[in-house]
Amino acid sequence: MLMKRHLNTCYRLVWNHITGAFVVASELARARGKRGGVAVALSLAAVTSLPVLAADIVVHPGETVNGGTLVNHDNQFVSGTADGVTVSTGLELGPDSDENTGGQWINAGGTGRNTTVTANGRQIVQAGGTASDTVIRDGGGQSLNGLAVNTTLDNRGEQWVHGGGKAAGTIINQDGYQTIKHGGLATGTIVNTGAEGGPESENVSSGQMVGGTAESTTINKNGRQVIWSSGMARDTLIYAGGDQTVHGEAHNTRLEGGNQYVHNGGTATETLINRDGWQVIKEGGTAAHTTINQKGKLQVNAGGKASDVTQNTGGALVTSSAATVTGTNRLGAFSVVAGKADNVVLENGGRLDVLSGHTATNTRVDDGGTLDVRNGGAATTVSMGNGGVLLADSGAAVSGTRSDGTAFRIGGGQADALMLEKGSSFTLNAGDTATDTTVNGGLFTARGGSLAGTTTLNNGATLTLSGKTVNNDTLTIHEGDALLQGGALTGNGRVEKSGSGTLTVSNTTLIQKTVNLNEGTLTLNDSTVTTDVIAQRGTALKLTGSTVLNGAIDPTNVTLTSGATWNIPDNATVQSVVDDLSHAGQIHFTSTRTGKFVPATLKVKNLNGQNGTISLRVRPDMAQNN
């Protein structure tokens, strides 16, 4: 239909149910907030109360329309300028569906300014059209083949950038969603949503999805950018709490506390990892020219590859001998290739896992670094610094120097001169021997085997027994608190407790020649202990839970809680002498002798009875002899 155009006039096509045809109705364009007159045809339609189907509004080149609302499948075709329009129709059939009708159409040469797109609303920006300062919220959407500048996506607001389309300066707020399709471009996007469920949570309904190109994106806390296999992102800045998932290409990413995950088939180049940033290269993923700065972390999983890495002082490398990593660190060139690691530096959260059949040479383990050598793996020329962590068992082969310069070795079922710092762990397998082991806050697990020389537990140390372990030498505890738990420790050795703090023996069967309590406190909890406790005054011995002590005590302060038992035998090496006895359990005098009766005695300086019992147990034949 040919329509005449007058100055400052636009036209509506209205379906007339009486005539069965469209009626052309004119409406003066709005200016300065004043509404123009509405054609009589519109008024007649309202008066008849007949249903009115979709109407089309045409804004011609050179014309400007201010305000107005589009509803009920209305269309506004903008070849001029539309300012301040509210769009609430066009998406009734679902996001970005070709079956939708209605909405605002920005044609080539047309401009839409300050548009608000609400629930079920759709703004379509055609090639050559421009939309600026658009707010899309509550499930509304914007479809781009043209240009959109400074769009804001709120509360399920969506933006679809098609091939040839460009979005500049989009802000994606909570539950907003931007999709960049193949051939589309988004620049300067700010992403504030998509990662609320945590790192790499299964969340594909918000954030930025890149199948085309994204440039100069900023990802803030809770923000997420997902790069599809067809997508590419350049110059991305990721802050703490934000992350980037890469199935395609990511170039020149800067991690300022944020995370980057490179998946199978994905590629990341020129990534800069600053403090608290974290780049993860998964199996099949590839990274090149990554730089790790102080407190940054690069993690390369088994099957992942990172080349030309620059690891600066204080940067962390986390990998295994099943990955491929090459680069430089403060020692020079390093590599992890084909199951062989060389010249690796581990610090500040760095870690190297040496798998069975693989090797590592010249590994430096400093504060916060961890070297984990699995059963069947080998690490030679290891240099342990203060705060370095070693994880190994007696089935591995490890040799090097401790932080104090002493040489240590694990191999052939024998461990010599190990020093386990806080976080370190060593497992002694059945039939193997550990000699002169020092545990400084680490964990020593014995699954049988033997302790030889002097085994030292310092503050924070734990010795866990599984099965029966033999100690024929000395187990000594120095300053601080330590724990001996589980299993059984047998043999003709002795336990020496010195320094302040508490040694707790829990759920353990302890059979030793003697226990020397020189300083501090010895707590026996739910354990069976067969030995004499030779103590110094001022120390304390506590029997708790269901503990049974078979042996004499001389002299110390003793506490028996309800359920604990102290059996005083007549063959003890010393008489039992107690300074302060707090007694709520059971004390029994027992005899293992035959022949003439030999009395046993208990001397107590101060007794605090708490419904405990003291009883004699003698053999009837002994009673008859006396």
What are these regions (language model features)?
Residues N472-A482, T490-T514, D526-N626:
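Extracellular beta-strand/loop-rich repeat segments of large surface/secreted proteins
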Residues L28, R137, Y239, R330, ...:
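Residue-level structural signal for beta-strand termini and adjacent loop
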Residues L50-D56:
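Sec/Tat signal peptide C-region and signal peptidase I cleavage site
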Residues L2-K4, D56-V59:
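Short, intrinsically disordered N-terminal pre-domain segments
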Residues V65, Q76-V78, A82-V87, Q104-I106, ...:
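Fold-core signature of tandem repeat domains
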